[in-house]
Curated annotation (Swiss-Prot):
Record: residues binding substrate: 130
Keywords, comma-separated and alphabetical: NADP, Oxidoreductase
Record bears the keyword Signal: no
This protein's name: Probable aldo-keto reductase 3
Recorded family membership: Belongs to the aldo/keto reductase family.
Record: residues binding NADP(+): 209-219
EC number: 1.1.1.-
Organism: Arabidopsis thaliana (Mouse-ear cress)
GO terms assigned for molecular function: oxidoreductase activity
Any single GO CC term annotated in Swiss-Prot or TrEMBL for this entry: chloroplast envelope
Amino acid sequence: MAESCRVRRIKLGSQGLEVSAQGLGCMGLTGHYGASKPETEAIALIHHAIHSGVTFLDTSDMYGPETNEILLGKALKDGVREKVELATKFGISYAEGNREIKGDPAYVRAACEASLKRLDVTCIDLYYQHRIDTRVPIEITMGELKKLIEEGKIKYIGLSEASASTIRRAHTVHPITAVQLEWSLWTRDVEEEIVPTCRELGIGIVSYSPLGRGFFASGPKLVENLDNNDFRKALPRFQQENLDHNKILYEKVSAMSEKKGCTPAQLALAWVHHQGDDVCPIPGTTKIENLNQNIRALSVKLTPEEMSELETIAQPESVKGERYMATVPTFKNSDTPPLSSWNAV
């Protein structure tokens, strides 16, 4: 049964970063999943999370774009900044309305300076490359990030949606503290190569969309209530031809959660937590009650037999549809050219 609990602390990676064992993904507070939440309500939710022990806050310069960081900046005033571990990201540019993945040194530096200004902070705790620029050797991008650490603008470096080979190459330039990847009961392809690579190198794992973008919270009926500007409407797994298949997975998880005395969302989150103390899920929400429910997932204990049952339920064939549309870059197409090919412009 899921009970109220204290949010424990974990070491993320092996460079000294300590975070709450569950974070808060802030993307949905300023759109993407429908309309933005009113600013006062969004700030109240962030403050409630921090007061509850969820101090690891995740944002990005492309959420909004930019408005999410501005919101966080307002929420962190009056001494709140010192209570949190702040993570943001760079690498997806929307200049002139066109999306472009960028990782050249000049862009890395400009993006960091802009994020510092929007967040109204002097240093970012964890700075991720949101998507990998496959035109720029990862060593070049990492070199500029290393300089930002030396200058005190960021404390730790992270990668998001990076392949195992890209992670290895990046790690030779400067230790990677965390890799952010989608990991949930319906997204498990990272278990084959990326998770073992992170563990070999002492890199923490941050799981985004641990509830399957809300699927394990609401099930297939979620689709009926999506706003027209909710980007999930375009995702393959939420298309009706795939949803009819995917709802079977939800029904099995729901039945198991009922026996367990928790919600399907809590069971799905507990499964991620049980992957190890080097894993930190960052579920997002716009409702305080859902935030409280997510925190209670930390109290759900799963036996080895229950973990095995869940993993049997959540085999790859139980999920139909890709994670993203074909145009969205992921770790599967994130390898970069060799360093020897680089000629700075």
